[in-house]
Swiss-Prot record:
Protein's recorded name: Dipeptidase 1
Protein's gene: DPEP1
Binding of Zn(2+) 1, residues: H36, D38, E141
Keywords: Cell membrane, Cell projection, Dipeptidase, Disulfide bond, Glycoprotein, GPI-anchor, Hydrolase, Lipid metabolism, Lipoprotein, Membrane, Metal-binding, Metalloprotease, Protease, Signal, Zinc
Lineage: Eukaryota, Metazoa, Chordata, Craniata, Vertebrata
One of the record's GO molecular function terms: modified amino acid binding
Organism: Oryctolagus cuniculus
Activity regulation, per record: Inhibited by L-penicillamine. Beta-lactamase activity is inhibited by cilastatin.
Length: 410
């Protein structure tokens, strides 16, 4: 399919493992598109986003899960880089910090043009494959990054965001996060508020993939039922295999199957084995389970490299993808199923999201109400009326009547 991949440095496979040999042959033709990598966050923490610092050189960077030699060795041909800002930025400087992390991805492409090609659509991914480069896309991790603004959502799209995780480890004013299911946060939106539904519709209109990693089960179901395009879980695993609330339960996996959506398995030990230690084989157990419940077309990889502190034995960094593919082949996965998990399932969903988008359609314009927002550092104009006034149309008129009576004008 993408024949120029033979130009990449060949991986020496000094082993009698025929499954690993086969895995390498598959990866040379169909490289992996990983759904979630937090290298930009590491570049912020270690170098304050100074990419020209000699220590930040991605050809030699040693203390991260990701660098250019590791990407090459792992046959990573596409990567959704995470533009992540922590929840403590919500109602503060989250938009600024999100823009800075998106800028890091663009500068990576500028500094290493022989390796990275920043793209924004499915055709761009295939172009990068043909050129033997890593297709570099941006996923914004956390709905708080749009600061409850449809205008910010649209602006981030124009700057390259192609998926938005509806929450991180905190509620937004319009969507509930997974900690609600654990009892650590209170449900505020019942999944998605009215404004949250507007966000989903606008993402469909724009062609932004809806990412349900980190959200509550109620939010998962609400978004899956509302979205007119398939959705993704960019870095989540199977709840039945490991009963962690960040993972996807069986009834949601059924909705994933019905909607043609994707679950990109996370490699974080705590989500893989529900313990501090895990193995590559246990990651394959999650992939097997999702394939059996939701179908092979639903399976993907979302390693969460450089975003987690513990990774399975055998999957220590991005170079280890050939070993994971070999394990799937060893378990009887067909070559077509493997190619789907590597890239083709994602390309299918991306194309469907692009087909559903209709930017000629009138954009969502109704802003959120000021009463629904947290924080005190906000101006008072440009918001909707409180939802209670929308539910009771006579409330505003009654309030005005009381005011006029008090002034003796009625």
């Amino acid at each position: 399919m993408w024949t120029s991949w033979w130009l990449w440095p060949l991986v020496a496979v000094c082993t009698a493992d025929s499954f690993l040999d086969q895995a390498v042959q598959i990866l040379r033709v169909t490289p992996v598109i990983d759904g979630h990598n937090d290298l930009p966050w590491q570049l912020l923490n270690k170098f304050n986003n100074r990419l020209q610092d000699s220590r930040a050189n991605l050809t030699v960077l040693a203390d991260t899960h990701t660098n250019i030699p590791k990407l090459r060795a792992g046959f990573v041909g596409g990567q959704f880089w995470s533009a992540y800002t922590p929840c403590d930025t919500q109602n503060k400087d989250t938009v600024r910090r999100t823009l800075e992390q998106m800028d890091v991805v663009h500068r990576m492409c500028q500094l290493y043009p022989e390796t990275f090609l920043c793209v924004t659509d499915s055709a761009g991914i295939q172009q990068a494959f043909r050129e033997g480069k890593v297709a570099s896309l941006i996923g914004v991790e956390g709905g708080h990054s749009i600061d409850s603004s449809l205008g910010v959502l649209r602006a981030l799209y124009r700057l390259g965001m192609r998926y938005l995780t509806l929450t991180h480890n905190c509620n937004t004013p319009w969507a509930d996060n997974w900690l609600v299911d654990r009892g650590d946060d209170e449900a505020q939106s019942g999944g998605l508020s009215v404004f949250g539904q507007r966000v989903v519709r606008e993402m469909n209109r724009l062609g932004v993939m809806i990412d349900l990693a980190h959200v509550s089960v109620a939010t998962m179901k609400a978004a899956l039922q509302l979205s007119t395009a398939p959705v993704i879980f960019s870095h989540s695993s199977a709840f039945t295999v490991c009963a962690h609330k960040r993972n996807v339960p069986d009834d949601v996996l059924q909705l994933v199957k019905e909607t043609g959506s994707l679950v990109m398995v996370n490699f974080y030990n705590d989500y893989v084995s529900c313990a501090s230690e895990a193995t590559l084989s246990q990651v394959a157990d999650h992939l097997d389970y999702i394939k059996n419940v939701a179908g092979a077309a639903a399976v993907r990889f979302g390693g969460d490299f450089d975003g987690v502190t513990r990774l399975p034995v055998g999957l220590e960094d991005v170079s280890k993808y050939p070993d994971l593919v070999a394990e799937l082949l060893r378990r009887g996965w067909t070559e077509a199923e493997v190619r789907g998990a590597l890239a083709e399932n994602l390309l299918r969903v991306f194309r469907e999201v692009e087909q559903v988008s209709n930017q000629a359609q009138v954009p969502e314009e109704e802003p959120i109400s000021l009463e629904q927002l947290g924080g005190s550092c906000r101006t008072q104009y440009g918001y909707s009326e409180a939802p209670s006034l929308h539910r009771r149309p006579g409330a505003l008129l009654a309030s005005l009547s009381l005011l006029l009576l008090s002034l003796g004008l009625l």
